[in-house]
């Protein structure tokens, strides 16, 4: 490519299109979407824009990609190994010089970062016709003035004499010292320039001292810590940005050799040598070399003393060689200008001196352009003939004097340009609730955006400034359904990065990757990986600035993760931990340790503590220290965001949706309506617990595989709803369709506008129906809800008690676990509380679907769906409290033939049958854990009947229950044994009279040798379905079987279990606690405590 010109003439549309086509090809290739419909659609849009306007607008992600790539292509930069770590401030919306000045002050503050320099670029509007350019007239944002003296000498920096003269003619009145910071001279939209003095507190200056020469400080040398180039043209995709400022950090020789010792700069070399006692009359004694070394020693020493980032020329050279190797491997070349790359000192003993380099030019790029004062078309009298009036300078200088940079004026301006992306994945809606709360908190100081992982464009992740992840874990370590794709995409990025960009083997990782991750993650704790922290990693460093240890696709992303889960499960918060680890492995910088929120204990308090802490760290990381803004955010944390004045029920202006449509919108699921065909109890009349069989007929075709789940939408019990309705106010007719509305505030050019907006999820529905079908009134209220209830109490003692529960985590958890109260029970406990129905509806969580394993086969039970459901009832308060009824199990038990039930299918790909019928199966499922296995044996029978010649492998079923009266599907199992569909059936009884107490894992241990043979020699698949405690006991027992009969060490056993999961031969379908007897509840709390302790770093 030809040497780039100065770019003084605007480009014609044809040239713009040629460059745009090339750039878009690079961009879409970088996100692995080259030649896709998205690429073609974007190219079409660009062509249309150019045809209409002669130019086009880059998207934000294209701009960020281009800015980083231009640094990567910069042939004269030795520090390009850091090219992906560039913070881009998109200021294309700025149209005034005062706006430009504000943005550049923000840039200086962010990049200086109290000495921990961060690379950044600020970009202003692009060139259009060449007559409305935006320009920064300074060659660097920070530089020292140079005053020509009558005797021909220069006071200050001789390099800037011409520009200093220009500033003086514009009206600048400096103190005229050797270290005056030049004002910023800015022009917007082709208009004449204005100048602005940079607040001195923004400029970090390093006063030079020497580690051994005390006299060095008497020279009063100093230099600014931030090298921010501001006079170059950014050329990207045919678009030219004539006004931009970008910075890295200093290499010591730039100051020590060039700025201090060049003869046309400060030229202090001879003075230094004389102070050293060297003879400066002859070059033979190498006095220049000796003095030059000591000046550079002083520069490095001084920066280190001030904890300011700098890199020495040896380290920089070595990092460039590494970068060169990387680029040759990844891009088959690296443009490099040898003359500029080789340091001005000790050249031949650096590796770059001996490195052959090829100089060629790539786009996007940063190019030189003529100084603005040489090309500007003045609209008023030229400054060389007289002073022009200063229109805005004095006004803005008044503002700068009136408020410090840490004020709202500057702090909030910076915050609007720093994006904080909050991602969530959820099954129950809790993570979504927390994510939105986090969005509100961060919205006080950042441009906060909240997305579900399933809706997030993964190609944007490399360009995020701040990423906050809030995610739950489904089952025993799996991602929520709307987080699966995100996790897989992260795996794909990591795989591509490890294999190499040009690898043709790159493909989407399968969901079984999560199974392996679930195993690997057990060996991971939040404290294991090195915590990358910009606040500490580069301070005073001469080597870390070019370290490549933390490089990766996400090396410019700062992140923090809050993981939700239940410590009743062994793989506590597994998916959140997995995402946290993946982000680190991809080069992301964790600004806060992973935090976990336990459903069993103090989840709300853990979230609020983490949210407050991560907000403070994020503000510190991005230099947002506006005290008022921080206080506003802290006030928002842990308080009721809504009030009785901002929520209301109103008559709707349109007809209510059908119940089916309303449920689909509320839960964002596609439901199928089913008719109940049969509902029968599976146990004998003497059985102490009820388990029912439900036969459903879908009203439309559904597709599923054995092992999948259904999500059932249940109703709250009528007596609970009636009790609640009797205690609420602000609604007269509970059966009138109403719309829940929230008062929204919008900032417009006309001021603050308030309007009532419909709730985003709750439909137009009667209040009775909302509390029956849409809102969760059985889960113990959150501390936020208790805080609101306290405000509605007329009795002061009740108000005091509720406030204690809302603010004391220990008291809340003890109360919650002992009473486990429904909302009506809470209102009974505090009878003077009278909440508003509207605010109560807004604060309550949605009533979530309950999941059940499918007990049928699509081959054996066409157009039918079977469920096996344990009916849950229990007493709270150690068995002495009121009877509680499981919401969904009792709802299903009460359904009669002909009743309608709404459900949806949730795929469980990790619990499907192997395709090969000859593969042996080991099935372990006590109680309702037998549910999916009934579908399995019916499915196997249907397959065997249709493929008579196929050899089928053995199927062993281990079932457990309390007594023989609870032996579910006993007759079906006996028939399957007779037909050879089941090979062996084992029964474990834990409460049968005159029979030794046994559990399924103990029965399995008794035939451990055979199980070992099936797994090792026959390739059997091992399935476990049941509660989390049983599943963990089975897992541990299987490890013991393998160790004993395989004569393995503990490490070999661990590796074997990892292998089973990696090969997708160990399958778990695990659910939480369904029985809340005192015995079970006490055991679950103790198990949860152990799992929490085990998961801590």
UniProtKB/Swiss-Prot annotation:
Binds 1 FAD. Binds 1 FMN. FAD binds at residues 704-715, 847-857. Keywords: Calmodulin-binding, FAD, Flavoprotein, FMN, Heme, Iron, Metal-binding, NADP, Oxidoreductase. The keyword Zinc does not apply. It holds the Pfam family NAD_binding_1. L-arginine binds at residues 140, 249-250, 254, 259. FMN binds at residues 426-430, 561-592. Residues 420-615 form the Flavodoxin-like domain. One of its GO terms (biological process) is nitric oxide biosynthetic process. Residues 387-410 are annotated as: Calmodulin-binding. It catalyses: 2 L-arginine + 3 NADPH + 4 O2 + H(+) = 2 L-citrulline + 2 nitric oxide + 3 NADP(+) + 4 H2O. InterPro entries: CysJ-like_FAD-binding (IPR003097), FAD-bd_FR_type (IPR017927), Flavdoxin-like (IPR001094), Flavodoxin/NO_synth (IPR008254), Flavoprot_Pyr_Nucl_cyt_Rdtase (IPR001709), Flavoprotein-like_sf (IPR029039), FNR_nucleotide-bd (IPR039261), NADPH_Cyt_P450_Rdtase_alpha (IPR023173). (6R)-L-erythro-5,6,7,8-tetrahydrobiopterin binds at residues 340, 353. Its EC number is 1.14.13.39. Belongs to the NOS family. This is Nitric oxide synthase-like protein. It comes from Bombyx mori (Silk moth). The gene is NSL.
């Amino acid at each position: 490519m030809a040497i780039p010109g100065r770019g003084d003439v605007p480009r014609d549309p044809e040239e713009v299109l040629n460059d745009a086509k090339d750039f878009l090809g690079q961009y879409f290739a970088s996100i692995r979407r080259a030649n896709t419909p998205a690429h073609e659609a974007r190219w079409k849009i660009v062509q249309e824009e150019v045809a209409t306007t002669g130019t086009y607008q880059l998207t934000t992600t294209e701009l960020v990609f281009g800015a980083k790539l231009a640094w990567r292509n910069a042939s004269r930069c030795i520090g390009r190994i850091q090219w992906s770590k560039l913070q881009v401030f998109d200021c294309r919306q700025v149209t005034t010089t005062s706006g430009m000045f504000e943005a550049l002050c923000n840039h200086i503050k962010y990049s200086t970062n109290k000495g921990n320099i961060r690379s950044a670029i600020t970009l202003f509007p692009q060139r259009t016709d060449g007559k409305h350019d935006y320009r920064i007239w300074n060659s660097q944002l920070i530089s020292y003035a140079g005053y020509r003296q009558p005797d021909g000498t220069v006071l200050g920096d001789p390099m800037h004499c011409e520009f200093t003269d220009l500033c003086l003619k514009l009206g600048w009145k400096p103190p005229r010292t050797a270290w005056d910071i030049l004002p910023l001279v800015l022009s917007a939209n082709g208009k004449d320039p204005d100048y602005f003095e940079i607040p001195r507190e923004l400029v970090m200056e390093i006063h030079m001292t020497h580690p051994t020469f005390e006299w060095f400080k008497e020279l009063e040398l100093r230099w600014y810590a931030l090298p921010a180039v501001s006079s170059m043209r950014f050329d990207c995709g045919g678009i030219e940005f004539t006004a931009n400022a970008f910075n890295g950090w200093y290499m010591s020789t730039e100051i020590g050799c060039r700025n201090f010792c060049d003869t046309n700069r400060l030229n202090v070399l001879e003075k230094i040598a004389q102070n050293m006692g060297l003879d400066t009359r002859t070059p033979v004694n190498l006095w220049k070399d000796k003095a030059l070394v000591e000046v550079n020693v002083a520069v490095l020493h001084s920066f280190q003393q001030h904890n300011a980032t700098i890199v020495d020329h040896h380290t920089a050279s070595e990092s460039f060689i590494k970068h060169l190797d990387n680029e040759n491997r990844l891009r088959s070349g690296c443009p490099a200008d040898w003359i500029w790359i080789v340091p001005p000192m000790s050249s031949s003993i650096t590796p770059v001196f001996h490195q052959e380099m090829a100089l060629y030019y790539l786009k996007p790029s940063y190019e030189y352009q003529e100084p603005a004062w040489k090309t500007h078309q003045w609209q008023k009298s030229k400054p060389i003939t007289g002073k022009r009036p200063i229109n805005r300078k004095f006004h803005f200088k008044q503002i700068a004097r009136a408020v410090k940079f840490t004020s709202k004026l500057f702090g909030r301006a910076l915050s609007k340009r720093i994006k904080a992306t909050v991602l969530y994945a959820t099954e129950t809606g809790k993570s979504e609730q927390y994510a939105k709360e986090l969005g509100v908190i961060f919205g006080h100081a950042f441009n906060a955006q909240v997305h579900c992982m399933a809706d997030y464009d993964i190609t944007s992740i490399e360009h995020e400034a701040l990423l906050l992840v809030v995610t739950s874990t489904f089952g025993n370590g799996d991602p929520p359904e709307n987080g699966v794709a995100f996790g897989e995409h992260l795996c794909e990025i990591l795989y591509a990065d490890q294999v190499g960009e040009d690898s043709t083997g790159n493909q989407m990782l399968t969901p079984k990757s999560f199974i392996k991750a679930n195993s690997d993650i057990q060996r991971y704790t939040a404290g294991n990986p090195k915590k990358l922290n910009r606040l500490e990693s580069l301070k005073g460093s001469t080597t870390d600035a070019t370290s490549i240890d933390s490089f990766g696709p996400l090396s410019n992303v700062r992140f923090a993760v809050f993981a939700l889960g239940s410590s009743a499960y062994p793989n506590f918060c597994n998916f959140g931990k997995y995402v946290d680890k993946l982000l680190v492995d991809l080069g992301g910088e964790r600004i806060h340790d992973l935090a976990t929120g336990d459903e069993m204990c103090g989840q709300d308090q853990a979230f609020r503590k983490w949210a407050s802490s991560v907000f403070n760290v994020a503000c510190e990381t991005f230099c947002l220290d506006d005290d008022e803004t921080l206080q506003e955010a802290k006030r928002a944390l842990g308080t009721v965001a809504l009030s009785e004045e901002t929520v209301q029920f109103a008559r709707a202006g349109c007809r209510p949706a059908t119940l089916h449509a309303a449920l689909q919108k509320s839960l964002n699921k596609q439901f199928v309506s089913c008719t109940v065909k049969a509902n029968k109890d599976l146990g004998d009349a003497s059985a102490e617990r009820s388990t029912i069989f439900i036969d459903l007929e879908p009203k439309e075709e559904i597709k599923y595989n054995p092992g999948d789940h259904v999500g059932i939408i249940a109703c709250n019990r009528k007596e609970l709803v009636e009790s609640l309705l009797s205690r609420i106010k602000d609604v007269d007719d509970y059966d009138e369709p109403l719309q829940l509305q929230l008062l929204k505030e919008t900032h417009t050019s006309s001021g603050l506008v308030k309007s009532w907006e419909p709730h985003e999820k709750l439909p137009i529905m009667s209040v009775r129906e909302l509390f029956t079908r849409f809102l969760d009134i059985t889960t113990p209220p959150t501390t936020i809800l208790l805080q609101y209830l306290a405000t509605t109490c007329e009795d002061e003692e009740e108000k005091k008690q509720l406030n204690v529960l809302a603010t004391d985590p220990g008291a809340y958890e003890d109360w919650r676990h002992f009473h486990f109260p429904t909302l009506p029970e809470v209102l009974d406990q505090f009878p003077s509380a009278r909440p508003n129905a509207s605010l109560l509806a807004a604060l309550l969580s949605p009533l979530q679907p309950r999941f059940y394993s499918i007990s049928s086969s699509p081959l054996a039970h066409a157009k039918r769906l079977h469920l096996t459901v344990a009916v849950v009832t229990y007493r709270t308060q150690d068995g002495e409290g009121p009877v509680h009824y499981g919401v969904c199990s009792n709802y299903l038990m009460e359904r009669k033939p002909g009743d309608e039930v709404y459900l949806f299918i949730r795929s469980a790909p990790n619990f499907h049958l192997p395709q090969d019928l000859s593969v042996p199966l080991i099935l372990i499922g006590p109680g309702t854990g037998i549910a999916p296995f009934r579908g399995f044996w019916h499915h196997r029978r249907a397959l065997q009947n249709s493929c008579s010649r196929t050899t089928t492998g053995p199927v062993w079923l281990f079932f457990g229950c309390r007594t023989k009266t609870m032996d579910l599907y006993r007759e079906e199992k006996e028939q399957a044994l007779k037909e050879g569909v089941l090979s062996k059936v084992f029964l474990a009884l834990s409460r049968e009279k005159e029979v030794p107490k046994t559990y399924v894992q103990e029965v399995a241990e008794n035939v451990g040798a055979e199980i070992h043979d099936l797994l090792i020699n026959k390739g059997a698949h091992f399935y476990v379905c049941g509660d989390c405690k049983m599943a963990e006991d089975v897992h541990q027992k299987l490890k013991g079987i393998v160790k004993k009969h395989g004569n393995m060490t503990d490490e070999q056993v661990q590796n074997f279990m990892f292998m089973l999961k990696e090969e997708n031969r160990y399958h778990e379908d695990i659910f939480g606690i369904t029985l809340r007897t005192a015995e079970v509840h006490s055991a679950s709390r103790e198990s949860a405590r152990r799992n929490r302790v085990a998961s801590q770093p």
